[in-house]
């Protein structure tokens, strides 16, 4: 899993993205 900061949404926060 990749943990990053999502600044592209109005609800900015920490996003957890699945990487294949």
Swiss-Prot record:
<dbReference type="GO" id="GO:0005524">
    <property type="term" value="F:ATP binding"/>
</dbReference>
<dbReference type="InterPro" id="IPR043129">
    <property type="entry name" value="ATPase_NBD"/>
</dbReference>
<keyword id="KW-0067">ATP-binding</keyword>
<dbReference type="InterPro" id="IPR018181">
    <property type="entry name" value="Heat_shock_70_CS"/>
</dbReference>
<comment type="function">
    <text>Acts as a chaperone.</text>
</comment>
<comment type="similarity">
    <text>Belongs to the heat shock protein 70 family.</text>
</comment>
<keyword id="KW-0597">Phosphoprotein</keyword>
<protein>
    <recommendedName>
        <fullName>Chaperone protein dnaK</fullName>
    </recommendedName>
</protein>
<keyword id="KW-0143">Chaperone</keyword>
<dbReference type="InterPro" id="IPR013126">
    <property type="entry name" value="Hsp_70_fam"/>
</dbReference>
<dbReference type="GO" id="GO:0140662">
    <property type="term" value="F:ATP-dependent protein folding chaperone"/>
</dbReference>
<dbReference type="Pfam" id="PF00012">
    <property type="entry name" value="HSP70"/>
</dbReference>
<keyword id="KW-0346">Stress response</keyword>
<keyword id="KW-0547">Nucleotide-binding</keyword>
């Amino acid at each position: 899993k990749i943990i990053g900061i999502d600044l592209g949404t109005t609800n900015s926060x920490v996003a957890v993205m699945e990487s294949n």
